[in-house]
C-alpha cells in the first residue's frame, strides 16, 4: 500500500439495475471514476450495494460486470487496496471478489483511523432500525441454512428471482427517498449510540441513497454517500479534510 495518497469512499452503484441511468452506461461511468482516482488513491472503500443483486454460487458467478471487475482487479494488482462492504443487495458473496479481484471483504461495520481521525464505516442496512419486520427480513437473508437451500436452485432461477425481488423494491420502482430528520433516521440514531461508547470523527454510510452531510455534534459528522443511479457522488479524504464530490 502507498504511504501517501487520498482515501476514496463510494457506495450504491447498483450495477445491473434497470432504473435511472442505463445499466451499461452506469458501469462505464463507475469505471471512469475508478480510473480517475486510482492514480492518487491510497485506498478505495466501496460501501455496499455495489451490485443490485449478487448471488455467488460455489462455482458460478453472475453474468456481466466485466468492465468493473477487470478495473478493480487492475487497481488491486497495482497495490491499491480496494475494500468491499456487503450491502443488503449484495451480501451473498463467497470468495470470488477476494481470490480473483483482490478485494478486501467486510461484512460488518469497521472503525479505523486515517491521519489521526477516527472513521466509522458501514453500508448501513439494519443499523439503528426499530422495524421488527426489517430485522426479521435481514435475519432470513443472513441465515446460513436458508442460503444453502437457495443455492440449490439452478443459477438461472436463483439469480432471476433475485433480480425480480430487487425490481419490486422502492428503489427498483424509481421512488424518491427523503431525509426524515435526526430523530427518525436510523443511521443517525445508530451513530449517536456509537458515540456513547467511543469518539468518532466521521461516520460514512451508504444505503440511504441521500447525498448529504449531517453535523451530529461539533466534533462528529455523518456522511451519506448517495448513489450512482442519479448522483455519482463520493467522498474523498485528503489527509486533513473530508470532501464530498460529484463525478460527471
Question: Which residues does each predicted region cover?
Answer:
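Core catalytic region of metal-dependent phosphoesterases/phosphodiesterases
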Residues: 2-6, 10, 15-114
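Nucleotide donor/acceptor-binding cores
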Residues: 5, 117, 220
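Active-site metal-binding loops of divalent metal-dependent hydrolases
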Residues: 11-14, 49-50, 88-89, 124-125, ...
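Conserved beta-sheet core of the metallophosphoesterase superfamily
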Residues: 104-107, 120, 125, 131-137, ...
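Structural motif
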Residues: 114-115, 237
Amino acid at each position: 500500500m502507498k504511504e501517501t495518497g487520498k482515501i476514496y469512499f463510494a457506495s450504491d452503484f447498483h450495477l445491473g439495475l434497470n432504473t435511472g441511468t442505463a445499466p451499461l452506461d452506469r458501469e462505464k461511468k463507475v469505471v471512469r471514476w475508478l480510473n480517475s482516482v486510482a492514480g492518487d488513491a491510497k485506498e478505495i472503500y466501496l460501501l455496499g450495494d455495489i451490485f443490485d443483486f449478487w448471488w455467488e454460487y460455489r462455482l458460478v458467478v453472475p453474468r456481466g460486470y466485466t468492465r468493473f471487475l477487470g478495473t478493480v482487479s487492475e487497481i488491486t494488482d497495482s497495490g491499491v487496496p480496494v475494500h468491499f462492504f456487503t450491502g443488503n443487495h449484495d451480501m451473498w458473496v463467497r470468495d470470488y471478489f477476494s481470490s480473483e479481484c483482490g478485494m478486501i471483504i467486510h461484512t460488518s461495520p469497521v472503525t479505523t483511523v486515517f491521519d489521526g481521525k477516527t472513521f466509522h464505516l458501514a453500508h448501513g442496512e439494519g443499523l439503528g432500525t426499530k422495524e421488527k419486520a426489517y430485522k426479521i427480513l435481514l435475519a432470513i437473508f443472513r441465515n446460513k441454512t436458508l442460503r444453502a437451500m437457495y443455492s440449490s436452485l439452478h443459477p438461472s432461477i436463483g439469480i432471476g428471482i433475485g433480480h425480480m425481488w430487487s425490481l419490486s423494491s422502492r428503489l427498483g420502482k424509481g421512488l424518491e427517498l427523503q431525509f426524515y430528520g435526526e430523530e427518525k433516521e436510523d443511521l443517525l440514531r445508530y451513530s449517536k449510540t456509537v458515540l456513547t461508547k467511543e469518539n468518532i470523527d466521521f461516520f460514512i454510510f451508504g444505503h440511504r441513497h441521500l447525498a448529504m452531510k449531517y453535523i451530529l455534534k461539533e466534533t462528529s459528522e455523518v456522511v451519506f454517500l448517495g448513489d450512482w443511479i442519479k448522483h455519482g457522488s463520493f467522498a474523498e479524504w485528503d489527509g486533513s479534510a473530508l470532501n464530498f464530490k460529484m463525478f460527471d
